[in-house]
């Protein structure tokens, strides 16, 4: 699956206006494409899609994410797409680590999975594996950054995001061994 993303720097108020217009998700049901909004999960939004076919596939997912933390906080994380119809929260897609201090524009052309129109389809987009070199980064990152798309009447609980607060000294300790290993492999080639 091809995933394109870019990170740009704009004033927060401009980004907020853009984002409130709504992140879009194009869903293919049978032979028809239908565009539905993705809203923050704290709105508990449920989207109704005309179920004319047997399976639903996700296509052309476009998400804009405004920075919710200062760039100086150094917070990064991976954007996950999960099916939370059961407790395992099956991973459908995961991006590389992204800087949450900048705007993120994410485009996913096609997701390699489909779900039956007869079943519940609670799909959640959210940041996980959050990393910050400062303890303050954890305090700053207090706003929910999850979006929910669902075809279910039931309520589902979202899996908790795990924080990795890494101090500068620990980060250096982690980096040093990997550099030594890389130099050894380079010299042997």
From Swiss-Prot:
Keyword Phosphoprotein: yes or no? yes
List, alphabetically, the GO terms of the cellular component aspect.
host cell membrane; membrane; viral capsid
> Does the keyword section mention RNA-binding?
yes
> What PTM annotation applies here?
Phosphorylated.
Q: Where in the cell is it found?
A: Host membrane
Q: Name one GO molecular function term.
A: RNA binding
Q: Please describe the quaternary structure of this protein.
A: Interacts with host protein HFI22.
Protein name stated in the entry: Movement protein p22
Q: Which keywords annotate this record?
A: Host membrane, Host-virus interaction, Membrane, Phosphoprotein, RNA-binding, Transport, Viral movement protein
Q: Which Pfam families match?
A: TBSV_P22
Q: Which family does it belong to?
A: Belongs to the tombusvirus/aureusvirus movement protein p22 family.
User: What does this chain do?
Assistant: Cell-to-cell movement. Displays RNA-binding activity.
Q: Which domain of life is it from?
A: Viruses
What does the record list as GO biological process? transport of virus in host, cell to cell
């Amino acid at each position: 699956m091809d995933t394109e993303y870019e990170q740009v720097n704009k004033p927060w108020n401009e980004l907020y206006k853009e984002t409130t217009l709504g992140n879009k998700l194009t869903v293919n049901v049978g032979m028809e494409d239908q565009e539905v909004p993705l809203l923050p999960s704290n709105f508990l939004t449920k989207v109704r899609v005309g179920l004319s076919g047997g399976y639903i596939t996700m296509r052309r997912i476009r998400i804009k994410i405004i920075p919710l933390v200062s760039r100086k906080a150094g917070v990064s994380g991976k954007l996950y797409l999960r099916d939370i119809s059961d407790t395992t929260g099956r991973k459908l897609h995961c991006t590389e680590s992204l800087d949450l201090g900048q705007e993120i524009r994410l485009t996913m052309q096609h997701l390699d999975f489909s779900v039956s129109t007869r079943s519940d389809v609670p799909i959640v987009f959210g940041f996980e594996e959050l990393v910050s070199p400062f303890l303050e980064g954890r305090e700053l990152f207090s706003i929910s950054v999850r979006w929910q798309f669902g075809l279910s009447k039931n309520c589902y609980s979202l899996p908790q995001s795990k924080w990795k607060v890494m101090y500068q000294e620990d980060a250096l300790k982690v980096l040093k061994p990997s550099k030594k290993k890389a130099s050894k492999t380079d010299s042997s080639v």
